[in-house]
């Protein structure tokens, strides 16, 4: 049916095209014969043909129906013309009915093919067009030509009516298939303007990175229950044959990010050491046998991507490690780590500084433990401090870092809002530091936590390839945390601020084989920085000045006498002194106190200089203009015959009135 509709549409478009061609041809000959009534009707016919063409092309039924109705009227008009030229009834083709009283007739009457008209020169009415008395030798008489034109128009109108009816039937009889607003779906030429509804929403305030981070955080929260169930089943299968050995040596394995697994704590709370608190905010290790140095390897379940290898060393296992107890009166600290640990939802965001970015694991959201994952960005070492620590066989451990400069060294090494002790980065540059919520009370001293044990860090004297100069295990984990036995000692609360080294202007030789004494001598010799080099002015370097020379010798050449005083004779210009303009400016004498009119000068640009606005050429033109006849009617002359200078603010300065 779609192909049929396209065929009907093409048929109607073809009929409209033929009608336009024939009516234009008829309109031209009607203009030549001054037939005004057919001319007006032909204009209307051309207009309705355009309506029909547009309706058939765009499937507009209203335009097609309008074209259909006009075709009936057009057939009636052409029928009248046929009857008029055939003299049917009382109609007479020699009357003035079609020419509207102008007396004109069809152009084909005297200009037909082979026609030879004969005119009567003795015409009575000179205002009417002259008609021939008789015409001989015409191939076709003009009435026959006009009847042929009208018959062709009637035939085309009938075909147009047929095509319009066929297309209108598609619109009127098949409304269930054809959508009036959308038109025929199978016609690619159909173009309809449809209303468009636009909904305005506010601009999102969150960035793309924050949105991606929040989506990842929610996804990890949804996956956490399933991972916990898998890890619980896996640990139950592995810990069943090793339950009798659990009191001697155990180590808790984490998930994919090597964090603390809380499921094993919930299954065996009685097996934990008595000095372990309930918050479980650190990875801990019991005192094992000195000869027990086996390797424990576990996986965190099916979701684990790699195995975590942990090797226990003898010097690490000779002392108990326990996290600092959590006090409800812990002094809050305005540090970056406490801000991250106090708000679990804030820790998931992309808050970071230049060297570290802290991320809290989703595993810590369900329990009370908090872990900060520090993404370390390695940078060149700034300073190394000689740290020495000794182990007592009795279990007492001396702090490897002096209490006064424990935090000051971290402030000196890391110029950030958040800085901790030097930890070794683990795998993929990630270091895990155990924290307590809301703040790690072992790192911040106050009045209410002086009597509590504090965390100290173990070090080694051997060199390390990392920036922190601390050893780390093969698995990438930092050294275990130690607590000294003398935990009741009061720690100082006044920590000195870091000092900034002075600027050393002495050139240091980059000799790698130089001894230590020479390096210390170079470091102790501190001198102030050298003064900046004196650079000549830009005009002195270029050898020229951007402003004109206004030395007294040159200024006298441009001095214009006041109009109130007598006119001075023109002086011979003095020779220009030799040298650059800068040399002449530096050697000039003080200006004489002669009253000079500064109306021709600009005193404001730039400060300290006076720039002349008129040159020698303009002064010569002014002299010639004064000598020439007065032709400028806008500027008058004074009574003395001199040209009056226009008033300006310069007149009030020098005391001259215009």
UniProtKB/Swiss-Prot annotation:
UniProt GO cellular component terms: plasma membrane
Phenotype upon loss of function: Flies are not viable. However, the decreased expression due to gene disruption leads to a temperature-sensitive phenotype with paralysis at 38 degrees Celsius.
Keyword Nuclease: no
Ranges of compositional bias, category Low complexity: 322-335
Transmembrane segments: 1-22, 31-51, 64-84, 152-172
Database matches in InterPro entries: Na/K-Atpase_Interacting
Tissue expression pattern: Expressed in the brain.
Renumbered residue ranges of the record's region Disordered: 222-241, 248-337, 571-601, 621-658
GO biological process: one example: regulation of sodium ion transport
Compositional bias per record (Polar residues), positions renumbered to this chain: 274-308
Alphabetized Pfam families for the sequence: NKAIN
Primary location group: membrane
Signal peptide from the UniProt entry: none
Keyword Hydrolase recorded: no
Function comment: Induces a small but significant sodium conductance when expressed in Xenopus oocytes.
Protein name: Sodium/potassium-transporting ATPase subunit beta-1-interacting protein
Organism of this sequence: Drosophila melanogaster (Fruit fly)
